[in-house]
From Swiss-Prot:
GO CC aspect terms: 90S preribosome; nucleolus
Source species: Arthroderma otae (strain ATCC MYA-4605 / CBS 113480)
GO BP annotation list: maturation of SSU-rRNA from tricistronic rRNA transcript (SSU-rRNA, 5.8S rRNA, LSU-rRNA)
Cited function: Component of the 90S pre-ribosome involved in the maturation of rRNAs. Required for early cleavages of the pre-RNAs in the 40S ribosomal subunit maturation pathway.
Name recorded for this polypeptide: rRNA biogenesis protein RRP36
Claim: Zinc is one of the keywords in the record: no
Chain intervals with Basic residues compositional bias: 336-348
UniProt similarity note: Belongs to the RRP36 family.
Acidic residues bias: start-end ranges: 34-43, 119-128
Domain of life: Eukaryota
Chain intervals with Basic and acidic residues compositional bias: 137-178, 258-268, 277-292, 349-365
Length: 365
């Protein structure tokens, strides 16, 4: 009896059946009022419903490993236990079996013991149901996750739209100047046009013929290089006829400007005339400075020869400019001198105003 309790354990799904068998056996014992042998016999019949399975099924229900030949050989105690189980099973009477059957009640129609194949099919169905439930729960979780992602994207899109508007407002505020005198802020980025300009004759700079004797590179030499130097009086004297040519060309351009009717042509002629006048004034100013410098050198040499000076005094650039300006105003007429002085005064005042600090400039302005 003790060996049966140790080796044979009912599965979880048969717990209810075990409870029913125990309760029915107790009722039968109390009703019969038998002796101790009868009580023992009834107690033994409690485990009878679970002994209708064969040995392999009992081992599978109890989750025990199958008993092999090696196990029987290695464990003689287990062999003796099995012999005891077989002897106890052979000693159970048919009356005890009938009592237990009556206590359990009649078997329902179609409630026969299920075969192992049917049990496996039911287990597979339960697994399929569990898989379908798992799949459904997984699909629900995926749908919920997609909904959250969609909401997050919508919120992000709305925030990005607001941020773009704010950035545009900040950019517009930055572009506005603090003062009308401040330079305008303009981005250096610009869209590159897909249209490409093909190099043609109009866009190519025309090669101008030049005379190396009057080239600026040649004329920029120091005073030691006499040939080609702008301070060389011999070169200025030899090419003095070029000034007459320039004056004649200037008169022709002024006549063309007077007769021209096209606005573009007029603008081009005006630009050329202004450039020639500026060059003429620059040449006159240079000739004036050259004459002043030559006079100063001649005077210093005479003083040294007379013994009034031991060393020559070289004229500075600032003093040279002052002497040239003085000689310029002396050669002018009264009206021209007045206009020139007024123009000079405005130029100096504008220059001083630019160099003045901003606070003082605003007060005086």
């Amino acid at each position: 009896m003790s060996l049966l309790g140790k080796r044979i354990r009912a599965p979880r799904e048969d717990d209810d059946l075990l409870d029913e068998g125990l309760s029915s056996s107790e009722e039968l014992n109390s009703a019969s009022g038998g002796d101790e042998d009868g009580e023992l016999e009834d107690a033994e019949t409690v485990r009878v419903p679970f002994l209708i399975y064969d040995d392999k099924e009992l081992l599978e229900i109890a989750d025990l490993p199958p008993i092999g030949q090696s196990d029987l050989e290695d464990s003689p105690s287990e062999k003796e236990g099995e012999n005891d189980i077989e002897s106890s099973l052979s000693q159970i009477s048919f009356g005890a079996l009938a009592k237990v059957q009556r206590s359990l009640g009649p078997l329902k129609k179609g409630s026969k013991r299920k075969h192992r194949g049917q049990e496996e099919e039911e287990e597979e169905e339960e697994q399929d149901n569990g898989n379908t439930k798992y799949k459904k729960s997984k699909l629900d979780a995926l749908n919920e996750l997609r909904e959250r992602i969609r909401r997050a994207k919508e919120g992000k899109a709305s925030k990005s739209g607001q941020s773009k508007d704010e950035e545009a407002a900040v950019k517009k505020q930055k572009e506005s100047r603090l003062s009308k005198h401040a330079p305008a802020i303009q981005s250096s980025k610009f869209a590159v046009s897909r249209r490409r300009v093909v190099v043609d004759g109009e866009n190519v700079a025309q090669v101008k013929s030049r005379d190396p004797r009057f080239d600026s590179a040649v004329q920029s030499y120091s005073h030691s290089h006499r040939l080609g130097s702008h301070s060389d009086p011999a070169a200025a004297k030899n090419y003095a006829f070029l000034n007459d040519y320039r004056d004649a060309e200037l008169k022709e351009l002024e006549e063309k400007l007077r007769r021209a009717k096209n606005e573009d042509e007029k603008q081009q002629l005006k630009k050329t005339i202004t450039s020639m006048n500026d060059r003429k004034r620059a040449l006159e100013h240079r000739d004036r400075e050259r004459q002043i410098l030559s006079k100063h050198r001649k005077r210093e040499r005479e003083l040294i020869k007379e013994g009034k000076k031991e060393k020559a005094w070289f004229l500075k650039k600032a003093d040279l400019k002052k002497e040239a300006l003085k000689e310029k105003y002396e050669s002018m007429g009264a009206k021209q001198r007045q206009k020139g002085i007024e123009r000079r005064r405005k130029k100096v005042a504008s220059k001083e105003k630019k160099e003045m600090p901003r606070s003082r400039r605003m007060v005086e302005g």
